[in-house]
């Protein structure tokens, strides 16, 4: 079975598993998590009893995760998104579904960042600092970090230098698009700098690791 067919079958199976959380149609935004990757994230939240989630890059997946947390009865999600249109849609959908008590979207435009590689931009430094600090102060250390933005792979590098200090021991770090060269470069650097061991599942395009104590 070739890789493309394997991925497509994995996505079809994931859509079936995700059906209980698909109460209504959600449009795909740019660079949305594939169904197989989203199902893997949902599994991690449930099996790992994750309760304090931060997501870099939001979309339909943010709404699905918020539905999961609301139905489970505990947990909170903070999503950071640079695209104003996407952030506005997700925030509006969360309000419309009454999910504002479990999930919040922050529109953080891209800007120069001291932790960025080369001339890459990341989310606005002060805005991210303020929002994440308030989130952690209210709900505790982050036990699941999902990195699916910004769009360009090496632009994602600052996520761990910036957020490592608010990760709980054993926190899950999940990175989408792990098969792309830029993401692989970032994963290698993170593994070396933060003593992480990433595992990549080709059918999901997701790399996962657990933060050390």
Which residues does each predicted region cover?
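C-terminal substrate-binding/active-site "lid" region of AdoMet-derived donor-dependent transferases
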Residues: 138-139, 143-144, 150-213
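A conditional alpha-helix N-cap/helix-loop micro-motif detector
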Residues: 31-35, 125-128, 153-156
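SAM cofactor-binding core of SAM-dependent methyltransferases
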Residues: 31-112
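Rossmann-like AdoMet
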Residues: 1-32
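A generic local structural motif
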Residues: 39-41, 129-135, 158-162
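Generic enzyme active-site microenvironment
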Residues: 53, 79, 146, 174-175
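Flexible, charged surface loops at secondary-structure boundaries
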Residues: 44-49, 71, 136-141, 166-167
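S-adenosyl-L-methionine
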Residues: 91-140
């Amino acid at each position: 079975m070739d890789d493309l067919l394997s991925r497509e079958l994995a996505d079809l199976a994931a859509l079936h598993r995700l059906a209980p959380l698909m109460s209504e149609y959600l449009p795909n935004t740019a660079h949305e998590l594939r169904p197989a990757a989203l199902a893997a994230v949902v599994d991690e939240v449930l099996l790992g009893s994750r309760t304090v989630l931060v997501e870099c890059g939001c979309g339909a997946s943010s709404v699905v995760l918020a539905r999961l947390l609301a139905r489970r009865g505990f947990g909170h999600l903070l999503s950071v998104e640079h695209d104003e249109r996407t952030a506005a849609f997700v925030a509006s959908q969360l309000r419309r579904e009454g999910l504002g008590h479990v999930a919040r979207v922050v529109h953080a435009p891209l800007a120069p960042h001291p932790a960025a590689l080369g001339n890459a931009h990341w989310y606005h430094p002060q805005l991210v600092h303020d929002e994440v600090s308030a989130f952690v102060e209210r709900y505790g250390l982050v036990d699941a970090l999902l990195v699916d933005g910004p769009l360009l792979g090496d632009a994602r590098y600052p996520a761990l230098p910036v957020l490592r200090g608010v990760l709980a021991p054993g926190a899950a770090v999940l990175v989408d698009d792990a098969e792309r060269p830029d993401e692989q470069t970032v994963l290698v650097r993170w593994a070396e700098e933060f003593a992480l061991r990433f595992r990549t599942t080709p059918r999901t395009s997701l790399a996962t690791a657990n933060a050390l104590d």
